[in-house]
């Protein structure tokens, strides 16, 4: 018997991806050990927006399946997880963007998503704080919000899961080396630690994308839906330089989250005044009343992005025993349940409800070294 064998599965990373994988595996009867260094990761830094995106079929399948799973899990979540289905309202500033909204509407409707096109007058009725002159919008009714740090903590407190705060300095297939030099082994090791994954697997094509967020003081509720400009999609996939887009999310506390920004080629966690100002200016262009609210805190986080915008979910093709759940960029909270279900289906050699192929690590890391 191997004295270092400590669990059926070791998961590196206690964010929402690692926590959801741990919960799903534990509910299949496996003993799970979750190791995390305790650094401020994307789960703590993000908005917790649960949304369906349809930029490509694989993204739509992953996000739509995940939102269904979140709705199934919702009755179990404690109140501090702040789960709400408040919908996303995509804002069209002009006729060109309204045409994009119409195209998204037809696509989502064809895939069974509850959505509604909203004209200029109806938009102001739904969200009176928006500026005059917007062309309209697209309401995705099943989208929602979640306080992801609380959800991750709840998941990790479930039966069959042990969590340790410790830094992993090396990974070799079925085993990991801790900061003090001790090795721990399991039948399976899952890497789910976001941008830190490249420290253990330098071959992973993961790029950090820095983002800023601001939260306001508490005010009487004035915003119902999560408000996102349709230009956000273009901004999110901009690969050449810094960008901002209006993203305003109401919290159950009466506060507003305000985003969003993207920067490349930096790991500096400091809030940058010029970028924060640019982001807030963009949000005020859509909701002028924001200029009169008190912002109480601003912070940054890093999205772990893959070259094609889809996560790497599956076995590492060159490292036997090592599995990957990384590269979710800004959709980690949304797609955590689908990620976990895809991994579990592969581990148990079971069919999955969505195709695994688009997310397999082989597309970047090559085919397995052996047949």
Describe each model-derived feature in a short phrase.
Residues 284-371:
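C-terminal catalytic lobe of FAD-dependent flavoproteins
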Residues 26-44:
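Glycine-rich FAD pyrophosphate-binding loop
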Residues 47-126, 283-284:
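Dinucleotide-binding Rossmann-like beta1-alpha1 core, especially the glycine-rich loop
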Residues 138-173, 178-180:
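Helical element adjacent to the flavin cofactor pocket in flavoenzyme catalytic cores
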Residues 23-27, 50, 81-83, 193-317:
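Active-site substrate-recognition segment that forms the wall
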Residues 10-12, 184-196, 340:
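Short hydrophobic core segments
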Residues 61, 90-100, 138-154, 270-275, ...:
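Short beta-strand to alpha-helix junction loop
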Residues 3-15, 33:
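Beta1/beta-strand and adjacent pyrophosphate-binding region of the FAD-binding site
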């Amino acid at each position: 018997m191997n004295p270092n064998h400590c669990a059926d599965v070791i998961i590196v990373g206690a964010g929402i991806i690692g926590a959801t994988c741990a919960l799903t595996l534990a509910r299949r009867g496996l003993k799970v050990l979750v190791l995390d260094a305790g650094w401020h990761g994307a789960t703590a830094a993000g908005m917790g927006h649960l949304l369906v995106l349809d930029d490509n079929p694989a993204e739509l399948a992953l996000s739509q399946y995940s939102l269904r799973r979140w709705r199934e899990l919702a009755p179990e979540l404690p109140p501090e997880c702040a789960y709400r289905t408040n919908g996303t309202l995509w804002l069209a500033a002009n006729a060109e963007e309204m045409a994009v909204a119409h195209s998204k509407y037809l696509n989502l409707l064809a895939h069974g998503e509850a959505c509604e096109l909203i004209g200029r007058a109806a938009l102001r009725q739904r969200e009176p704080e928006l500026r005059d002159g917007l062309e309209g919008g697209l309401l995705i009714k099943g989208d929602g919000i979640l306080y992801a740090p609380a959800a991750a903590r709840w998941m990790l407190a479930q039966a069959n899961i042990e969590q340790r705060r410790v830094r992993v300095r090396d990974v070799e297939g079925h085993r990991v080396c801790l900061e003090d030099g001790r090795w721990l082994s399991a039948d399976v090791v899952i890497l789910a630690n976001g941008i830190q994954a490249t420290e253990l697997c330098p071959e992973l094509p993961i790029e950090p994308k820095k983002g800023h967020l601001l939260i306001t003081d508490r005010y009487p509720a004035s915003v119902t839906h999560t408000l996102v400009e349709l230009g956000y999609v273009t901004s999110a996939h901009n690969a050449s330089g810094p960008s901002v887009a209006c993203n305003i999310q109401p919290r159950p506390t009466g506060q507003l989250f305000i985003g969003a920004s993207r920067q490349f080629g930096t790991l500096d966690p400091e809030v940058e005044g010029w970028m924060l100002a640019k982001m807030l200016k963009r949000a005020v262009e859509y909701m002028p009343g924001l200029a009169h609210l008190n912002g109480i805190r601003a912070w940054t986080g890093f999205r772990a992005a893959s070259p094609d915008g889809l996560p790497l979910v599956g076995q590492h093709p060159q490292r036997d025993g090592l599995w990957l759940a990384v590269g979710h960029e800004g959709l980690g909270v949304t797609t955590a349940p689908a990620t976990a279900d895809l991994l579990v289906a592969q581990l148990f050699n079971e069919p999955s409800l969505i195709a695994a192929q688009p997310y397999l690590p082989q597309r970047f890391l090559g085919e397995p070294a052996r047949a």
